[in-house]
A protein has these predicted regions:
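Transmembrane-lumen/periplasm boundary regions of multi-pass, lipid-linked membrane glycan transferases
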Residues: 44-50, 174-175, 182, 187-321, ...
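Extracytoplasmic catalytic/substrate-binding loops of multi-pass membrane glycan-assembly enzymes
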Residues: 33-50, 56-59, 65-77, 87-91, ...
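Transmembrane-helix motifs of polytopic, lipid-linked glycan transferases
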Residues: 95-115
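Short acidic/glycine- and proline-prone juxtamembrane loop motifs at membrane-interface regions
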Residues: 90, 94, 135-146
Length: 540
C-alpha cells in the first residue's frame, strides 16, 4: 500500500471535499428555476412531462410512444424531483446533472489533495474553466452523469491501492450497472475501460483480467435485460429500434459521422482550458526524460492513460459529439494543474506562468469579448453595465492576489472561475434563450388553439426535431399530425390549426392554403413561424 497521507488527514480531506462540492453545487444551480427550455434539453423535459402525466416506465415516451434511444433512468430522477412541485421546470430537469458535476468536483479533490491541497483546488479550477463542462452542467446531460460514474470507478480502484480504501471495491459493479442504466452499453464500457487502463499501466494483470471478464459478463446480462424490457415495452419492432439506435446506428454512421481524429482536434476548443494545457503538461513531462515517477506523477500517468482510452474508444463509432468524451475531462483537469504540484523544472515554471497569466487576464478578456458580442447583438446585450463592473472588480482582485505570494495561485484562479461562470449565467444563457426561444410562440399558439379547439398539424417541423421543441411548451397529451411535403399538407381536412415556418408558408402553391392569412406570426428557434387556421367551409 502506498498511503498518500495519514488517516486523520484523509478525514480532513473528505470534509474539505464535501464543502467544495456543496459550494460548486450552489454555483451550478444559481439562477435556475423557471428558465425557458431550449435545444437538446427539450427532449428530456418532454420525457419527464409525459412521465409526470402517465407514471414511470422503463423507457421514456414521446407522443405516448416509447423512445428507443435511452432508458428512463435520468427521466425518473427528474420525475421524482418534479412530483412534489406538480410540474417539470428547468430546476428539476438540471438538478441531477448539477449533482453529478458536484460529485466530480468532490472526487477530483479527493484524488489530488492527499498529495497537495493546492493541486486539488487548482484541478477543480481547471475543470470549472472548461467550456463544455460549463454548458453541460447547466443542462440535462447524460454524458456528465456518466463522467461522474467513470471517475467514481477510477477513484475506487486508485483509492484501494493508495489510500487504504479496500472495503469500497464492492461498489464497482453497482456503479457499472448505474452507468448502463444512464447511458446504455457505452455507460458500462467507458467506466470499465477507465479502470482497466489503470490496472494495465500498473501491471496488475490478475485484477485486469478478473475485473474485465466480470464486466464483460455484466455487459451481456445488462444488454439481455435491456432487450427484454424493450420487447415488453413496445414489442418486436421497438426492440429492433433499440438495437438500431443504441448499438448499430452509432457504429455505422447512420446517426451522424465524423472523422477519426475529431475528438483529438475539436477538444482544443471544446475542452479548453483543461485539454490543451494538459497536452502541454504531458509534453513537459516527456521532455524531462525518464525518471522514477513519484506517486503524484504516477497519478498523472494513470489519468493520461484513462483519458486517452476514453478518446480512442469513442473514436471507433462513426457518431461523434463533443459531449460524449466528458469522462475524459476530470483526468485532463488533474493533469493540467500538475505544474503546481511540482517545484522543479523550467518547463513547469513556464506553464505555471502561462496559467497564472490566463487566469489573471480572463476578466479583461471577457470584457473585450462582451464588447464585441454587443456589436453583433445590440438589442439583446444593451444592459451590460453591471456585468462590466463585476468583471472589473474581479480583475482588480486577481491583480491584487497575484501580488501576494500566499494568494498568487488561488486568487487569480478563483477570480477567473467567478468571472466566466458569472458571464455564462448572466449574459450567455439569457442570450441563448432569447435567440432560440420557442416558448413565447408555442404558448401563444396553445392559447389560440384552446380558444377554438381543432386538430394541430405540424408541417416541416420533424417529429423528433423542432416538433419536440414545440410540444415541450404545449405540455399536454394532444398528439399533433405531422406533414413534411406540400402534397401531404393538401390532404388535411378542415378545421385544423397549421404550424409551419414562414418560408414554408410562402412556398405553398395550394390556393386553399396560400390564401389563408396567418393568425399568428412569431420567432421560433431563431426562425419566423406562422400559425394558420384552416376553417371548414360553410355549406351554402
Amino acid at each position: 500500500m502506498n498511503k498518500a497521507q495519514p488517516p486523520l488527514q484523509n478525514a480532513t480531506i473528505r470534509y474539505q471535499s464535501l464543502g467544495l462540492g456543496l459550494l460548486a453545487l450552489v454555483l451550478f444551480i444559481v439562477g435556475n428555476w423557471h428558465q425557458a427550455i431550449i435545444g437538446f434539453d427539450s427532449r428530456f423535459v418532454l420525457f419527464a412531462q409525459e412521465m409526470l402525466r402517465h407514471g414511470p416506465s422503463f423507457f421514456p415516451t414521446t407522443y405516448g410512444q416509447p423512445y428507443a434511444d435511452y432508458l428512463a433512468t435520468s427521466t425518473l430522477l427528474t420525475w421524482l424531483l418534479s412530483v412534489p412541485l406538480g410540474q417539470v421546470n428547468s430546476f428539476t430537469a438540471w438538478l441531477p446533472t448539477a449533482v453529478a458535476s458536484a460529485f466530480i468536483v468532490i472526487l477530483v479533490f479527493r484524488l489530488t489533495a492527499p498529495y497537495s491541497p493546492r493541486w486539488g483546488v487548482l484541478s477543480i479550477a481547471m475543470l470549472l474553466l472548461s467550456s463544455t463542462f460549463i454548458s453541460e452542467t447547466r443542462a440535462v446531460s447524460l454524458d456528465q452523469m456518466l463522467a461522474a460514474v467513470a471517475l467514481a470507478v477510477f477513484y475506487l480502484g486508485y483509492a484501494h491501492d493508495h489510500f487504504g480504501a479496500a472495503k469500497r471495491l464492492h461498489w464497482l459493479f453497482p456503479l457499472l450497472i448505474l452507468g448502463f442504466a444512464i447511458r446504455g452499453p457505452i455507460g458500462l464500457v467507458i467506466p470499465t475501460g477507465v479502470l482497466c487502463s489503470y490496472y494495465l499501466i500498473n501491471r496488475q494483470w490478475r485484477q485486469l483480467f478478473s475485473f474485465g471478464l466480470l464486466a464483460l459478463a455484466l455487459l451481456g446480462a445488462c444488454v439481455g435485460l435491456l432487450l427484454l424490457l424493450a420487447k415488453l415495452s413496445g414489442g418486436e419492432v421497438f426492440m429492433q429500434d433499440v438495437i438500431r439506435m443504441q448499438f448499430l446506428g452509432r457504429m455505422d454512421g447512420t446517426e451522424g459521422s465524423s472523422g477519426v481524429l475529431y475528438y483529438f482536434t475539436s477538444s482544443m476548443g471544446n475542452y479548453a482550458l483543461a485539454y490543451p494545457v494538459a497536452l502541454l503538461v504531458l509534453l513537459a513531462i516527456a521532455a524531462g526524460g525518464r525518471r522514477t515517477p513519484d506517486p503524484a506523477l504516477k497519478l498523472v500517468l494513470y489519468c493520461a492513460a484513462a483519458g486517452l482510452l476514453v478518446m480512442l474508444g469513442l473514436s471507433v463509432p462513426q457518431a461523434k459529439k463533443a459531449r460524449y468524451i466528458l469522462p475524459m475531462l476530470p483526468m485532463a483537469a488533474i493533469i493540467a494543474a500538475y505544474p503546481f504540484q511540482v517545484t522543479q523544472g523550467r518547463l513547469f515554471a513556464w506553464l505555471r506562468g502561462l496559467m497564472l497569466g490566463i487566469w489573471t487576464l480572463l476578466p479583461t478578456l471577457l470584457i473585450i469579448g462582451l464588447v464585441a458580442a454587443r456589436k453583433r447583438y445590440p438589442a439583446e446585450l444593451e444592459s451590460l453595465g453591471a456585468m462590466f463592473a463585476l468583471l472589473g472588480v474581479l480583475q482588480v482582485l486577481a491583480l491584487l492576489a497575484l501580488a501576494k505570494a500566499r494568494l498568487r495561485a488561488f486568487g487569480p484562479a478563483l477570480a477567473a472561475v467567478l468571472a466566466i461562470w458569472a458571464t455564462y449565467i448572466v449574459v450567455v444563457e439569457p442570450l441563448e434563450r432569447s435567440l432560440y426561444d420557442t416558448r413565447t410562440f408555442s404558448v401563444a399558439v396553445k392559447t389560440r388553439i384552446l380558444q377554438q379547439p381543432a386538430p394541430v398539424v405540424l408541417h416541416g417541423l420533424g417529429k423528433d426535431a423542432k416538433a419536440i421543441k414545440f410540444m415541450v411548451n404545449f405540455d399536454c397529451d394532444k398528439v399533433p399530425l405531422f406533414t413534411q411535403s406540400p402534397a401531404e399538407l393538401a390532404l388535411i381536412q378542415a378545421p385544423a390549426w397549421l404550424v409551419m415556418s414562414q418560408a414554408d408558408f410562402e412556398s405553398l402553391t395550394e390556393p386553399r392554403l396560400r390564401s389563408i392569412t396567418p393568425t399568428l406570426t412569431g420567432a421560433f428557434d431563431k426562425n419566423p413561424y406562422v400559425l394558420l387556421h384552416l376553417e371548414k367551409m360553410s355549406s351554402p
